[in-house]
Every structure is written in C-alpha cells, then in structure tokens.
Amino acid sequence: MKKILALLMMVGLIFCLGGCNIPWMKQKTEKTKAAKVIQADKVEGTMKGMKLKVGVSNDMAPFSYYDSEQKKITGFDIDLLDKLSEYLGFEYELYPMNMKKLEQKIKNKELDLAIAGISITDERQREFSFTDTYYETYLQIVVRKDSQITDRKEITEKKVGVVEGTSSAQYAEDYLSEDNKITYYKNITKVWNDLEKGTIDATIYDTTGIQNYMKEHADNTNLSVLNEQLNSEESNYGIMFVKGYKYLDQFNVALQVLNNDGTYQKLKEQWIKTKE
C-alpha cells in the first residue's frame, strides 16, 4: 500500500477540489496512451440518479463478508463503496456471490461492477476494465503447525486447497508441481476448516485475509504461515467492470479524492490490521 499511497500523494500535489487538472494513470499492462486530463470538480455527482448492481463477496473478511450479528454484508470494500457512492452520486444494490459468478455476470452485463478484494491479474485485464489499485497485497502459503513444512518447495506432492476463480487458484495452477493435488473450493471458510482438520495440507491466500483469520482464531488455530511472499504484482486489488466501462475515469478520480482527503486511510485503519 505504501507504493500506491506514494503515487496518489504525488498526484495529490497537483490536485485540488477547485478544479485542478489531474493527469490520469492507467494500469501498466494496458497499451500506453496520451495522458488524459480530468477536472476534479466536474466529476463529483456525475453519476447522480444511477442505481448500480454491485457484485461482492460474503466470505472475504475483512474486505467483504457477511456479519452474522449485523445480518448484512460489511467490510472495508463495502465502506469504500459507500464513500464512492456519496462522492459520485450513484445508489447501489449488493449482490453477494463467488468469484466465478462475479466474472460471468460482469461479462453478461448483469452487474455494473464488482468490488470484492479482486486481484488485477494480467489475465483478467484482457477481459475486464479495472480501476487503479486501491489496495496492495500478496499471496502466502498456510500450513498446519504439525506439518513440518517450512518452505514453498516442501509442499510438492501435498494436497493444496484454493478458492476457485481467484488469483490464489491461478498461482497454484501456474506454479505448483504436477505432483500436487489441487482441490478447488467455493469459499475460503471451507478451506480453513479442511486445513485445520488435515483434509488438505496447505492453502494459498491473500496475506490480509490470512492475517485476519489468524487474528480471529489466535487461541484455537493449528495453522502456521510461511514467510515467503508470492505473486505480489498480480495480487493487488481493483474495482472490476465490463471492458471499456464508460465511468471508469470517474471512479479513479473518486478514489484519489478519498485518498487525498484522508477518508481512505481512516477506513484502512478501521478495517485492516496488518503487520507493516
């Protein structure tokens, strides 16, 4: 996150709510185009009157998950979406589902956008449009404490569980040995349960989600996290839209506004407790 904050603060030096021009930056894997200039004061409220269908996860704490006590979907992504809604003026309705369904419904234009801790991978960028990164993360491997596994190379021939349709699943398919048995799950809760029981030997998951689980189960978990950081460049999160989405620039401007005025940092401090 330090890299993206540094970038946004650099942009913030030429940004003001009174109408300063913002040179726009696209994802680095897209073809380079001439810098696009947008006036910030012409973006606020430009989506007023629109009601968007938003795909989210109900199982990706602390970003987007179902809170059984509040009986609703909540998390960092949901609060960020709410602030984007306030700035741009749109209303929204949440549709919780797994990643594979999110991608399919975005393609079919049954959803307007998805915000669910979605990694901006090269493969996804060929099919979808993304905002600039709003959260930097990476992948790690989790094993049982009694497994004696201390290194990535030691999971060869082991059973590895991953959530289908995620960057974790893609990493497993691309980099694990042919001797590994990969088991695909609909949600991360089932992965954690099976890993705790020993049904699988390891999992690969986003570090923030791992830290959230370890914190919530500090007194009763039998799991251990390997130190190695994996796949950092393709693990960062962005908001996903159908390819060529008309209002992509508005969302990018709004994200910068929320960073520059301190809103983003407040949400991060509220929801995400990570080791720096």
Residue ranges and their predicted role:
Residues 21, 78-87, 146-149, 153, ...:
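Extended ligand-binding regions for polar small-molecule ligands
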Residues 78, 86, 91-154, 224, ...:
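Acidic, polar ligand-binding/catalytic clefts
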Residues 58-61, 73-86, 118, 140-192, ...:
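Bilobed "Venus flytrap"/periplasmic-binding protein-like clamshell domains
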Residues 22-44, 48, 167-186, 221-227, ...:
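Ligand-binding clefts/hinges and TM-proximal coupling segments of bilobed small-molecule sensing domains
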Residues 104, 118-126, 171-174, 197, ...:
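A ligand-binding cleft/hinge motif common to bilobed small-molecule-binding domains
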Residues 33-117:
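Extracytoplasmic small-molecule ligand-binding "clamshell" domains
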Residues 16-19:
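C-terminal motif of bacterial Sec signal peptides marking the signal peptidase cleavage site
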Residues 58, 136-143, 207, 215-256, ...:
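Periplasmic-binding protein-like
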